[in-house]
Amino acid sequence: AEKDCIAPGAPCFGTDKPCCNPRAWCSSYANKCL
């Protein structure tokens, strides 16, 4: 089953899923969790 979070380096723009890393955030510029 797919986890309900965004893996490091995966595209995140346009989704409301959180980053799997709680210390990361979605960078709209890089379009990935940083």
UniProtKB/Swiss-Prot annotation:
The UniProt keyword set, sorted, is: Calcium channel impairing toxin, Disulfide bond, Ion channel impairing toxin, Knottin, Neurotoxin, Secreted, Toxin, Voltage-gated calcium channel impairing toxin
GO molecular function terms listed in the Swiss-Prot or TrEMBL record: calcium channel inhibitor activity; toxin activity
Extract the signal peptide range.
Answer: none
Report the locations given in the UniProt record. Secreted
Give the family this protein belongs to, as stated in its UniProt record: Belongs to the venom Ptu1-like knottin family.
Q: What's its job?
A: Binds reversibly and blocks N-type voltage-gated calcium channels (Cav).
Q: What protein name applies here?
A: Toxin Ptu1
User: What lineage, starting at the top, does this entry show?
Assistant: Eukaryota, Metazoa, Ecdysozoa, Arthropoda, Hexapoda
